A protein has these predicted regions:
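Short, solvent-exposed secondary-structure boundary motifs
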Residues: 5, 151-156
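A gly/proline- and charged-residue-enriched helix-loop-helix capping module
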Residues: 137-153
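Short, Lys/Arg-enriched N-terminal segments with co-localized hydrophobic residues
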Residues: 1-13
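Sec-dependent signal peptide recognition
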Residues: 15-23
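N-terminal secretory/targeting leader peptides
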Residues: 30-139, 156-157, 162-375
Length: 375
């Protein structure tokens, strides 16, 4: 049993009693040959060994390192009271089995992206990101200061899961293509790996969205199972070698403007933890949430230069009319989904309101500054 405030108080009282006895004996002149036995047993803190399953390949840069860093920080800050063993996708459960594993309690923790679970909890997509939505800084602000976190935990509560923000990729690229996209006609019949609402947008535009875990993407693209794939951005895309399987690299990543990653914890296991470990886990996740964003911001620049300058990748911008049509479709889908589901609507209204408010300020601050800087 973990040492609580009561047992600590008892320790202090026992120490004082022994010291008072010793002082009285010394004062009374009975100090010679006095042996005072101080034989108090201090309760040992209960230790915890948890398993964490992820939707990413083991030790994969950025995505896969986020849970590893959380595990290391928790063990260090708890002085070994908690040890978390991290398993990559497929080692114990499939990439898309993480949510169920944590929900059922077969594993205490998981690390993934909320949009993978749209079939279970449609509102979960907002906590990764939605097309033309919040950037990394904005979704962090909405989650931590705008009521998003409370909504997130409300959405996951029926599944016995306690979510914590745990990483962000920043704005992504649209993806890798084996044919040029010059108009909306080029989207028709296009088989592309793209999850979440982005996949729904592609489908309405005439494309064929495909769901595949990261570890299968290179082979699927190289063999023609799919015509295109989105993944993350230059840093991660370079490590998968997509430049060897596709010629064109399209931007902007309208579908994932600031993708937040999630640490999932079984609610029963979380409730049973002592307060100190809860604080340690929350603190570690918050530190890694920013650390991963910093890593992507720093590494994407170098990786993009290498893709273009060394590997000869053709960097292409999506035509304006294609982007405009995607935006119209995305807005329609968000509104329709909100109209069909009370929980989705509740989250959507909060997300939408925050985006409108933060966008108004960013137009005259960050957006205006970046435009001036790049002129």
């Amino acid at each position: 049993m973990a040492c609580n405030g009561l047992c600590k108080t008892r320790e202090i009282i026992m120490k004082k009693i022994y010291l008072n006895i010793l002082a009285l004996l010394l004062i009374s002149g009975c100090s010679e040959n006095i042996e005072v036995e101080y034989d108090v047993e201090f309760p040992q803190k209960k230790t915890y060994e948890w398993r964490l399953v992820t939707a990413w390949p083991k030790n994969y840069p950025g995505l896969g390192m986020a849970p590893e860093r959380i595990a290391n920080l928790v063990e260090e800050m708890s002085d070994g009271q908690m040890k978390i063993t991290v398993y990559g996708a497929g080692e114990q459960v499939p990439a898309f089995g993480v949510f169920d594993a944590v929900s059922s309690g077969s594993h205490q923790m998981g690390h993934s992206g909320g949009y993978f679970w749209k079939g279970k909890a449609p509102a979960a997509q907002f906590f990764t990101g939605v097309p033309f939505g919040l950037t990394a800084d904005e979704i962090n602000a909405w989650t931590n200061r705008g009521g998003g976190l409370e909504l997130w935990r409300e959405v996951y509560a029926p599944f016995n899961i306690y979510p914590i923000p745990a990483g962000n990729t920043g704005t992504q690229m649209f993806g890798w293509f084996n044919k040029e996209i010059n108009s909306l006609d080029d989207i028709k019949g296009l088989k592309m790996r793209i999850p979440g609402i982005g996949g729904e947008v592609l489908k309405r535009a005439g494309g064929i969205p495909v769901t595949l875990p990261g570890g299968e993407l290179f082979t699927a693209l190289q063999t023609g199972v799919i015509d295109a794939t989105e993944w993350v951005g230059p840093y991660n895309d370079l490590t998968f070698g997509f430049q060897q399987a596709a010629k064109y690299y399209y931007y902007p990543g309208w579908h994932e403007p600031g993708s937040m990653l999630e640490l999932l914890i079984n609610q029963d296991e979380w409730n049973a933890l002592p307060k100190n470990l809860k604080v340690i886990i929350e603190t570690a996740a918050k530190a890694v949430n920013q650390d991963i964003l910093d890593e992507y911001t720093a590494r994407n620049n170098k990786a993009l230069r290498e893709l273009v300058d060394v590997h000869g990748v053709e960097l292409r911008k999506l035509p304006d009319d294609v982007i405009a049509e995607f935006k119209v479709i995305a807005t329609d889908i968000l509104e329709e989904n909100a109209a069909k589901d009370e929980t989705v609507n509740k989250v959507y209204q909060s997300y939408k309101k925050f985006k409108e408010e933060v966008s108004a300020y960013h137009k005259v601050s960050e957006d205006a500054f970046v435009e001036a800087r790049n002129d």
